Every structure is written in structure tokens, then in C-alpha cells.
């Protein structure tokens, strides 16, 4: 049995995918690597097929028409057979030593008959252009080195999140969650790091810097120019997240999970309002009104909580342009703090 299914969605990734895949191959026969060619127009598919020839027992290749990052993850999950499931973007990579420790930990848990539903590990923001890094860890938020439940997860502050880069889901639990990501949409990692969580009842935090998240390409979705341009896609993601669970469902979750799910929603709602208000147009104003209306019509209790008792409540009281200015300054500060900008 493969311990981890790594899914690597690729679109025109010829320049950097080899570093990513080579870092995963260090785990050997304990893993499978599913390379998803998402309609690339360069030699991504050729590179993927070469890897499959050279490592036939480890590499799988899916060739599909372009459907966006979410569709690549969906396709990979459909083919995955490993005990755990992990998405690795094609311009990112995993640390060999830390990955070996994770594999060893998984084996130990299997031997003891107590495999957790989700592994959490640190990730590293890498910005090679300025030779700088920033490690995102969870040492103050949860116990390390043992299996625990959500009741032991402490409150997260605003800038701290369990992003997709940190999470290794048990595959059967991920499937059970019914998570299917929208196609042709950026920022779907927000959904992926939110919707499956209630199905993950037992957790294990491995305090190792496993995932290296590359920052610096001009076409990246976190680039502020792209954020402003792609606000409608972030709004779609926010709709998916608010549709996933009602406020009543969230309230009934275990304390630590309930607190984190709410924190997650608050943060992504702030991001959504920022994406929208970072520029002005009549269309943007109407789109934001439509988003709030959608949330209100589906779940009035969740609407009231988000609109009037969340991180976004104060910015929503400000005039549009001032709101956009304040939130942009906040985003740029956060970027500087974690080396995004």
C-alpha cells in the first residue's frame, strides 16, 4: 500500500516541475506521484511521461484538457490509492529529511493501529529573489508528536492559518467529505483547507518544515495585481465555503473545530472583501452586494455573524475607497511580515 498519494497539478510547468517531482521521489516506493497535465502548451506532458517511464511503480500521469487547479486536484483524487492525500504545486517542493520523518511516523502509527485522520506540518515561504524565507509553524496552537483531537487546538490569531501546504488528509476521509473543487478558478486551496476539516477527527502535528512554498513568479495568484483582477473568483470560493456548512452546523462541532472553522471563514471573508474593494467599479459594488445577499438568503444566522460580528465588520462600515485603501495597506503589511511581497 502506498502511504501518500502526491498530486502535482501542472500547467506549463516545464521550467520548475522537475525540482518538485525529484523532491517527492526521495520517498521511494512508499508513495505514488500523480502528475496531472492540465492542458499545457509546453513540454510539461513530455517531461511527465519521461518520469513515468523511469519510475513506473511510483509515477502516474493524467493528461486532460485545461480546467484549472481545482480540476487537477479533482482528477488526482479520483486516481489516488494512497492512505493519505497531498497536493503539491508544481513550483513548490518538499524537504527530503522532513518527508522521511513523516513517512517514518506514518509507518509507526500504522504498526500501532492508530493512524490519525490528518497530519499537520510546517511550511516555508521561499522567496529566492531576495534569498529570504519565513517558516509558518503551529507550536503554540497544538501539541506536537502525539495524536490529539480538536479539543486541544488553541485559538488562532488573525494572520495564522492552516493552509493547504500544511495538511496531509487521510484519503478516505477526504472522499467522505465530498470535497469537489470548482474548475477554472483560482484560490480553491481555501476550500480544500476548510471543507474536509469536520471529517478529520484525529490529528497529528509533526513539527518539521516539510513544504516549501515558492513566492516570486509574476503570474502567481498571490501577486497583488492578480488579486485585484481575480476578485470574482475569490467571491466564488467564498460562496462555496459559506455554502458548505450552516452556522448551526458549525456551532454543533467540537469546541476547537468550531472555533477554527469560524476563524477560517472570517479570514477568507476579509480576503474576499479586500480583493473586491482594492479597486472601484459599479460592477464590483454590485458583486459584493450580491455575495452578501447570497449568504443572507441561504443562512441568515451565518450572514449576521459574518456581517456584524467578524473581522470584516469594521471595514464594511467604511466608505468604499477608504475601505480598499485600509485593507490594501493591511495586506501589504502581512506580505512584508511573511515575505510574500
Describe the function of each predicted region.
Residues 22-31:
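Short, acidic, metal-binding catalytic loop of nucleotide-sugar glycosyltransferases
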Residues 85:
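Short aromatic/hydrophobic "clamp" motif used to bind/position activated sugar donors
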Residues 1-23:
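N-proximal low-complexity "stem/linker" segments adjacent to membrane-targeting elements
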Residues 69, 92-204, 213-227:
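Donor-binding/catalytic cores of nucleotide-activated saccharide
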Residues 16-18, 42-51, 93, 97:
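Acidic helix N-cap motif at the loop->helix transition within catalytic regions
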Residues 64-80:
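Glycine-rich, basic loop-to-helix element that forms the pyrophosphate-binding segment
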Amino acid at each position: 500500500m502506498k502511504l501518500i498519494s502526491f498530486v502535482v497539478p501542472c500547467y506549463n510547468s516545464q521550467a520548475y516541475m522537475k525540482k518538485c517531482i525529484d523532491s517527492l521521489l526521495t520517498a521511494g516506493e512508499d508513495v505514488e506521484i500523480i502528475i496531472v497535465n492540465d492542458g499545457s502548451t509546453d513540454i510539461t506532458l513530455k517531461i511527465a511521461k519521461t518520469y513515468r517511464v523511469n519510475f513506473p511503480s511510483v509515477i502516474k500521469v493524467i493528461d486532460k484538457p485545461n480546467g484549472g487547479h481545482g480540476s487537477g486536484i479533482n482528477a488526482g483524487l479520483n486516481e489516488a490509492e494512497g492512505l493519505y492525500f497531498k497536493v503539491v504545486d508544481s513550483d513548490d517542493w518538499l524537504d527530503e529529511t522532513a518527508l522521511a520523518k513523516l513517512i517514518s511516523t506514518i509507518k509507526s502509527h500504522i504498526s500501532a493501529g492508530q493512524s490519525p485522520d490528518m497530519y499537520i506540518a510546517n511550511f516555508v515561504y521561499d522567496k529566492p529573489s531576495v534569498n529570504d524565507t519565513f517558516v509558518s509553524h503551529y507550536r503554540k496552537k497544538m501539541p506536537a508528536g502525539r495524536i490529539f483531537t480538536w479539543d486541544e487546538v488553541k485559538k488562532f490569531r488573525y494572520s495564522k492559518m492552516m493552509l493547504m501546504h500544511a495538511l496531509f488528509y487521510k484519503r478516505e476521509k477526504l472522499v467522505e467529505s465530498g470535497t469537489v473543487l470548482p474548475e477554472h478558478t483560482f484560490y480553491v486551496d481555501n476550500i480544500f483547507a476548510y471543507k474536509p476539516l469536520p471529517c478529520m477527527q484525529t490529528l497529528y502535528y509533526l513539527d518539521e518544515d516539510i513544504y516549501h512554498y515558492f513566492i516570486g513568479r509574476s503570474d502567481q495568484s498571490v501577486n497583488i495585481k492578480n488579486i485585484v483582477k481575480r476578485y470574482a473568483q475569490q467571491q466564488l470560493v467564498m460562496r462555496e465555503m459559506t455554502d458548505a456548512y450552516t452556522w448551526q452546523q458549525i456551532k454543533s462541532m467540537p469546541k476547537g473545530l468550531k472555533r477554527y472553522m469560524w476563524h477560517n471563514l472570517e479570514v477568507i471573508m476579509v480576503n474576499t472583501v479586500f480583493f473586491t474593494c482594492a479597486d472601484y467599479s459599479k460592477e464590483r459594488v454590485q458583486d459584493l452586494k450580491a455575495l452578501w445577499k447570497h449568504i443572507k438568503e441561504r443562512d441568515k444566522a451565518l450572514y449576521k455573524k459574518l456581517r456584524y460580528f467578524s473581522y470584516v465588520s469594521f471595514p464594511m462600515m467604511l466608505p468604499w475607497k477608504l475601505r480598499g485603501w485600509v485593507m490594501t495597506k493591511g495586506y501589504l503589511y502581512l506580505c512584508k511580515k511573511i515575505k510574500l511581497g
